């Protein structure tokens, strides 16, 4: 069980919905980052990315809550696969779930159960494990950064390699993507807290010179809101390395007993 869970989230553009989501229970935390479709692209779906994020978050929350009393917890990839299937089933007959531009999202997830802290990362929203002995362990899925040819990626390359061997994996309409997530567990006594961030917050590390230890310290001492404010200040002062000035930004810091 977590003793305290703090969260902050801010949209990248006040005129658009926030396509990030954070949801938490007594023993678990989920952070989801919806992938904004490029302008003019036909997703083949009647729903937008915010709909997918809300549906997937609700399905994961329901699955995690129902599984919490189980003496032997269901592995996180299995829960995510079921939640993706639940979400796919909520689409209507007019939605083309085979469209390579259909709505998708990254998922970061932690759960305290049976003396372990389980973690799962699918896409570029990492988990930071604050270790009981000091320091931080980063659980990240960097496959999106290792596509052939380097950035900027063409739309056709992303379409071809999304949820494909040798490419990158996200939560969309294929439950089998969950098996490709980075996942594992550690002894609960070895961890004092867990941080989960979307890439709108990890810009601090990726673009602006912070270390992962710096980010974990900010989350632990000043809180998620301060981390979001820090990235906004740097974006305004220095500009983005690529893409839009501001992205949706979400951070969570969940403390464990003894922290």
What do the PLM-derived regions correspond to, one by one?
Residues 1-259:
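PP2C/PPM-type serine/threonine phosphatase catalytic domain
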């Amino acid at each position: 069980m977590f003793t305290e869970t703090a969260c902050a989230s801010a949209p990248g553009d006040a005129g658009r919905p926030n396509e990030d989501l954070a949801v938490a229970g007594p023993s678990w935390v989920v952070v989801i980052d919806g992938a904004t479709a490029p302008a003019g692209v036909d997703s083949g779906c009647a729903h937008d990315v915010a709909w997918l994020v809300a549906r997937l978050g609700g399905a994961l929350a329901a699955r995690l809550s129902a599984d919490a009393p189980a003496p032997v917890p269901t592995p996180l990839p299995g829960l995510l696969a079921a939640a993706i299937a639940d979400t796919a089933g909520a689409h209507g007959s007019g939605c083309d779930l085979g469209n390579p531009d259909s709505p998708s999202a990254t998922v970061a997830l932690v759960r305290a159960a049976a003396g372990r802290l389980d973690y799962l990362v699918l896409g570029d929203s990492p988990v930071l494990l604050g270790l009981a002995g000091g320091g931080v362990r980063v659980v990240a899925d960097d496959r999106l950064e290792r596509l052939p040819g380097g950035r900027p990626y063409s739309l056709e390359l992303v379409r071809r390699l999304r949820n494909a061997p040798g490419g990158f994996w996200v939560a969309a309409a294929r439950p089998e993507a969950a098996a490709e997530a980075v996942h594992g567990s550690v002894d609960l006594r070895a961890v004092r807290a867990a941080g989960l961030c979307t890439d709108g917050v990890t810009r601090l590390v990726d673009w602006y010179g912070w270390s992962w230890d710096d980010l974990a310290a900010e989350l632990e001492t000043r809180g998620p809101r301060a981390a979001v404010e820090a990235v906004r200040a740097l974006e305004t002062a220095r500009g983005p390395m690529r893409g839009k000035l501001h992205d949706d930004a979400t951070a969570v810091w969940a403390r464990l007993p003894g922290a």
